[in-house]
């Protein structure tokens, strides 16, 4: 009932709301974010915004033409994170795993995927994913986050 009320409130407040999709090459893009220690029991929240745009150029442009999202993912991480960087890497891990079936579906529909650009707003998490950080200082991070490095896009 609460969700229905929220939807009706949104529809009343935004009577001219629209979702806009423009023609693109159907390449999947991800915008990943995390909020550190904002949920109960010292947990962190992650969000993923998955949208389709043109094929990325090299180097990947910072601001592609945005379409409305094909998927928006919000979740609370199960484990307590020890830093904002670890929360961001947890968000990258979750969002990149969520993108795998989307990439496969797009490929099966005739839109092969090259790189899937993933944007994060944390410089340390970006450096960690691109192997530009000293490993001795990142040992506190769980081994499952090394998956992000293996799947680096």
Across the structure, where does each feature detected by a protein language model lie?
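Residues immediately flanking
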Residues: 32-34, 54, 120-122
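A short, polar/acidic, helix/strand-boundary loop motif
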Residues: 54-90
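Two-metal-ion RNase H-like nuclease active-site motif
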Residues: 21, 26-41
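C-terminal reverse transcriptase regions that engage the nucleic-acid substrate
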Residues: 1-16
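Short acidic, Gly/Ser-rich segments with clustered Asp/Glu that frequently serve as metal-coordination loops
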Residues: 34-43, 48, 124-126
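RNase H-like nuclease module associated with reverse transcription
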Residues: 78-153
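Beta-strand segments within the central parallel beta-sheet cores of soluble alpha/beta enzyme folds
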Residues: 2, 20, 115-119
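A short acidic-Thr-Gly-centered motif at the start of a beta-strand
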Residues: 16-26, 107-111
């Amino acid at each position: 009932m609460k969700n229905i009320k929220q939807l009706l409130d949104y529809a009343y407040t935004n009577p001219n709301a629209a979702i806009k999709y423009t023609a693109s090459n159907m390449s999947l893009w991800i915008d990943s974010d995390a909020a550190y220690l904002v949920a109960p029991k010292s947990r962190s929240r992650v969000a993923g915004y998955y949208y389709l745009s043109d094929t990325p150029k090299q180097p990947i442009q910072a601001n592609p033409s945005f379409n409305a999202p094909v998927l928006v993912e919000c979740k609370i991480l199960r484990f307590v994170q020890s830093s904002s960087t670890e929360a961001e890497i947890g968000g990258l891990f979750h969002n990149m795993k969520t993108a795998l079936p989307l990439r496969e579906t797009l490929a099966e529909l005739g839109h092969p995927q090259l790189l899937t650009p993933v944007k994060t707003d944390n410089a340390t998490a970006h450096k960690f994913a691109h192997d530009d950080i000293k490993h001795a200082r990142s040992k506190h991070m769980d081994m499952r986050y090394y998956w992000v490095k293996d799947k680096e896009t």
